[in-house]
UniProtKB/Swiss-Prot annotation:
Pfam families hit by this protein: AcetDehyd-dimer, Semialdhyde_dh
Biological source species: Mycobacteroides abscessus (strain ATCC 19977 / DSM 44196 / CCUG 20993 / CIP 104536 / JCM 13569 / NCTC 13031 / TMC 1543 / L948)
Gene Ontology terms describing biological process: catabolic process
SUPFAM superfamilies, sorted: Glyceraldehyde-3-phosphate dehydrogenase-like, C-terminal domain (SSF55347), NAD(P)-binding Rossmann-fold domains (SSF51735)
Name of the protein described by the UniProt record: Acetaldehyde dehydrogenase 2
This protein's UniProt keywords: Aromatic hydrocarbons catabolism, NAD, Oxidoreductase
Gene Ontology MF terms in the entry: acetaldehyde dehydrogenase (acetylating) activity; NAD binding
Length: 311
């Protein structure tokens, strides 16, 4: 496999592959800055590198053996990379908000996309990976007419790629809340928290529902958190799921075809990073790289899981 993007996300993903994966191996690390720490670390670890971007990757001798390519660049760059790589029959895992391919949130729809043979899978956003499982957990037991998520991350964990993709973050996450999470309408907000010491990633999920059994929703949410934590150990519920009666009309938030709202469900999450390359407060980046690694390994197992997967 290869990683395009030698910044924080790409480098953390490389470290995860080397340390954690038994069925993936690093074939190449691709960047555009020959002085980047990510390329230097890759070289020290014996990984082939190029600072010539996707063109450099295509011309590397390892390219023929690469089956899966992670793209950890930016939304605009991924669109260019996907077009350039299209003739080569590679499977792409997109860690940008470009959404060239279908949205993937592993515990919700990964199996379906692997079965369909999709070759470009989009990992939505860090906020999407943290919150869409919760929206789905609620919507699978009670219709969600509106869902709103707020992702609060440390400013120190927001590199140039994250900052350049703020608009794409909100748009992509909101669409995925609807298409993957199952809400009739979705909204996403991101907050860059400048506090020092840097805080852990915090996520808030609000779902508007009709009359529903609180115990059923609570159990569904806890089951989903347990599932996500199998590949993101630092993913946890910060406090009990809360239910508030809605008495005022919510017409401004609802679409015409949605039903009656009687209850607001509030879920408060915390994501602590594993500290493989990035500090533990960068849970927003850790959940993306962990979800991407889980996706790649699942793609391989969906083929022939009895064999080790090479480059």
């Amino acid at each position: 496999m290869a990683i395009i993007g030698s910044g924080n996300i790409g480098t953390d993903l490389m470290i995860k592959v080397i340390r954690r994966s038994r069925i993936l191996s690093m074939g190449a690390m691709v960047g555009i800055d020959p002085t980047s720490d990510g390329l230097a670390r890759a070289a020290r670890l014996g990984v082939a590198t190029t600072a010539d971007g996707v063109e450099g990757l295509i011309h590397m001798e390892q390219f023929a053996e690469v089956a899966i390519i992670f793209d950890a660049t930016s939304a605009a760059t991924h669109r260019e990379n996907a077009a350039r790589l299209a003739p080569y029959d590679k499977r792409l895992i997109d860690l940008t908000p470009a959404a060239v391919g279908p949205y993937v949130v592993p515990p919700v729809n990964l199996g379906a996309h692997i079965a369909s043979g999709a070759t470009n899978l989009n990992m939505v956003t860090c906020g999407g990976q943290a919150t869409i499982p919760i929206v789905h957990a609620v919507s699978r037991v009670a219709p969600v007419v509106y869902a709103e998520i707020v992702a609060s991350i440390s400013s120190r964990s927001a590199g140039p790629g994250t900052r350049a993709n703020i608009d794409e973050f909100t748009e992509t996450t909101a669409r995925a809340i609807e298409q993957v999470g199952g809400a009739a309408r979705g909204k996403a907000i991101i907050v860059l928290n400048p506090a020092d010491p840097p805080p852990l990633m915090r996520d808030t999920v609000f779902c508007l529902v009709g009359d529903a059994d609180h115990g059923t929703i609570r159990r569904s949410v806890k089951e989903m958190i347990a599932e996500v934590s199998t590949y993101v150990p630092g993913y946890r519920l910060k406090q009990d799921v809360q239910f508030d009666r809605v008495d005022e009309p919510m017409r401004a938030l609802l679409r015409d075809t949605t039903g009656t709202v009687t209850t607001k469900v509030s879920v408060f999450l915390e994501v602590e990073g594993a500290g493989h390359y990035l500090p533990s407060y960068a849970g927003n980046l850790d959940i993306m790289t962990s979800a991407a690694l889980h996706t790649a390994e699942s793609m391989v197992r969906g083929g022939d899981s009895s064999q080790e997967f090479g480059i």
